[in-house]
From Swiss-Prot:
Entries under InterPro entries matching the protein: Ribosomal_uS4, Ribosomal_uS4_bac-type, Ribosomal_uS4_CS, Ribosomal_uS4_N, S4_RNA-bd, S4_RNA-bd_sf
Pfam families xrefs: Ribosomal_S4 (PF00163), S4 (PF01479)
Assembly information from the UniProt record: Part of the 30S ribosomal subunit. Contacts protein S5. The interaction surface between S4 and S5 is involved in control of translational fidelity.
Protein name in UniProt: Small ribosomal subunit protein uS4
Family designation: Belongs to the universal ribosomal protein uS4 family.
């Protein structure tokens, strides 16, 4: 896990934003790229480079979703009715690992995915161990009793009410959450400017 933490902070510096809004993020004090020439600000980014960076930021933010998964999500969003960008974010935000993270059951998206893959999360009363499962309105999330008292989980849950977005609910006494609705892009609490339109333009070429 320590390697993941170091790696994610390095990603923030490489991509030029504090990806998860973490106070420990090295980007807050060294807001330039890692490496020997990181402080060289004279490098001009091409139009393609700007689009690519917007995509890399979102992929990294959602726990380094693979390129194949990301493209498949875009393809599905494109086939759906409505705005492709809104659909795209709605699909990403309905993933089980994302919802576990948003509910503050886990402190990071990486920890959330680990909880899911290790079978510590229940979906509608049944074990769910696939991070990419897409939730529907009204779906219920529970934490298995065997991990409810783990300090890391308790500390994360204590932040309930501070950052849990309005499209989710979480009941602390029962440690049960509910997926209320598909969020709009404006509902999602990104700690950086998520330039979704650039990602859509890149994949639409």
């Amino acid at each position: 896990m320590t390697k993941i933490v170091r790696s994610k902070y390095k990603a923030s510096r490489r991509l030029g934003v504090s990806l998860w809004g973490d106070s420990k993020d090295a980007f807050n004090t060294r807001n330039y790229r890692p490496g020997q020439h990181g402080q060289n600000t004279m490098i001009k980014t091409s139009d393609y480079g700007l689009h690519l960076k917007a995509k890399q930021r979102l992929k990294c933010y959602y726990g380094r979703v693979t390129e194949k998964q990301f493209r498949n999500i875009f393809a599905l969003a494109q086939r759906m009715k409505g705005n492709t960008g809104e659909n795209f974010i709605g699909l990403l935000e309905s993933r089980l690992d994302t919802v576990v993270y948003r509910m503050n059951i886990a402190p990071t998206i990486f920890a959330a995915r680990q909880l899911v893959s290790h079978g510590h999360i229940k979906l509608n009363g049944k074990k769910a161990d696939i991070a990419s499962i897409r939730l529907k309105e009204g779906d219920i999330i529970e934490i298995k009793e065997s991990i409810q008292q783990i300090p890391l989980i308790q500390e994360s849950i204590s932040k309930q009410g501070q950052t849990t977005p309005g499209y989710l609910s979480f009941d602390i006494p029962s440690l049960t959450g509910k997926y209320l609705r598909v969020p709009a892009l404006s509902d999602v609490p990104y700690p950086f400017e998520a330039e979704v339109h650039l990602v859509i333009e890149l994949y639409s070429r």
